[in-house]
């Protein structure tokens, strides 16, 4: 059943080659540069000037002032401080978590683990 479609396709190709098409037909016209519009390159001296302006420190400073209101590229970062947290009472609010951490049964963690924990240099200290 494919042969009628192939015949119709070849018939269209042959008839399009015999008449002059209004637009270039990609089946009949080989792809050459005559059908492409070549893009005109900009003036190379203008490109050089644009590159110089892009890397000009005065231009960068002016753009930084205009965009951010400052000439500084980086803002000062706040210094980290020691973390001091208070742990919740294990066993009363967290179910079996206190018994798992303390190593005892469910009631083993109710009274003994009310503490303030200071985290410094990776060590845990119970007070």
From Swiss-Prot:
InterPro entries: Adhesin_P1_C. Residues 70-90 are annotated as: Disordered. Belongs to the adhesin P1 family. This is Putative adhesin P1-like protein MPN_203.
């Amino acid at each position: 059943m494919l042969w009628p479609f192939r015949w119709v396709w070849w018939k269209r190709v042959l008839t399009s080659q015999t008449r002059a098409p209004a637009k270039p037909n990609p089946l009949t016209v080989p792809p050459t540069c005559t059908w492409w519009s070549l893009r005109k390159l900009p003036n190379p001296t203008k490109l050089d000037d644009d590159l110089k302006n892009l890397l000009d420190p005065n231009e960068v400073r002016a753009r930084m002032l205009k965009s951010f209101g400052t000439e500084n590229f980086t803002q000062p970062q706040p210094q980290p401080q020691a973390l001091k947290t208070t742990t919740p009472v294990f066993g009363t609010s967290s179910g079996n978590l206190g018994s798992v951490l303390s190593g005892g049964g469910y009631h083993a963690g109710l009274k003994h683990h009310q503490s303030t924990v200071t985290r410094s240099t990776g060590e845990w200290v119970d007070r």
